[in-house]
């Protein structure tokens, strides 16, 4: 898979999310902030029958994602656009599954990592609002984020009618979790299952 210096690069969090998200045959899947298309590639490797749509604001990322899908002879749609305009870009409830590895750090947090890691172009609320619009009732939204933002994440999910149902922490051995994987259901009933952590050596 080709990567580019001005496009958010492949990381272990994307790998973890690609393995955590539940994907079923012939589902329509939306990747919010798709970057170079890595999550779509993971999911297509697991279930080739799905229909992947990637969305990214960065035109270089969109071009790279299209190249990566084509290089692997995979059929996917990649859209250049702002997820804050999801209502204009996609019909309501069009997707069975929405996935995202969004910016982690709130503006003003003191972290300096560019828009791919900082909430400069979109906030956690923006991501959840877009997912809540695009996913169908009973559909799923899978996201990876930072453990210290978990309360913010749960609040945003419920604000947009998505109920957290599955969760797994990701950590190095003998260290605190560095990431958390969450899958929420649109209009789901309360009841969260917490899985054993994924431990990285």
Task: For each feature predicted by the language model, list its residue ranges.
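Conserved SAM-binding strand-loop segment of SAM-dependent methyltransferases
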Residues: 73-83
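Conserved SAM-binding motif I beta-strand of class I
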Residues: 51-56
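A short acidic, Gly/Pro-enriched loop at the edge of an enzyme's catalytic core
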Residues: 89-97
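Conserved class I S-adenosyl-L-methionine
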Residues: 27-33
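Conserved SAM-binding loop
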Residues: 65-66
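Conserved SAM-binding loop of SAM-dependent methyltransferases across substrates and taxa
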Residues: 36-49
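Mobile active-site "lid"/loop adjacent to the S-adenosyl-L-methionine
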Residues: 102-130, 138
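Conserved Class I SAM-dependent methyltransferase catalytic core
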Residues: 2, 6, 123-177
């Amino acid at each position: 898979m080709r990567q580019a210096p001005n496009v958010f690069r492949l990381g272990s969090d994307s790998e973890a999310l690609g393995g955590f998200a539940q994907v079923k045959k012939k589902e329509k899947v939306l990747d919010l902030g798709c970057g170079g298309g890595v999550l779509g590639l993971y999911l297509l490797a697991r279930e080739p029958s799905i229909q992947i749509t990637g969305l990214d604001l960065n035109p270089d990322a969109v071009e790279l994602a299209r190249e990566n899908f084509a290089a692997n002879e995979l059929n996917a749609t990649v859209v250049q656009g702002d997820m804050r305009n999801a209502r204009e870009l996609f019909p309501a409830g069009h997707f069975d599954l929405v996935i995202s590895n969004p910016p982690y750090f709130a503006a003003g947090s003191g972290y300096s990592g560019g828009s791919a890691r900082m909430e400069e172009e979109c906030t956690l609320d923006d991501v959840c609002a877009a997912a809540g619009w695009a996913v169908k009732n009973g559909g799923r939204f899978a996201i990876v984020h930072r453990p210290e933002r978990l309360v913010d994440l749960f609040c945003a999910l419920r604000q947009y009618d998505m109920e957290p149902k599955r969760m797994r922490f990701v950590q190095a051995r003998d260290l605190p979790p560095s990431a958390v994987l969450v899958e929420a259901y649109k209009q789901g009933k309360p009841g969260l299952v917490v899985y054993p952590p994924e431990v990285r050596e």
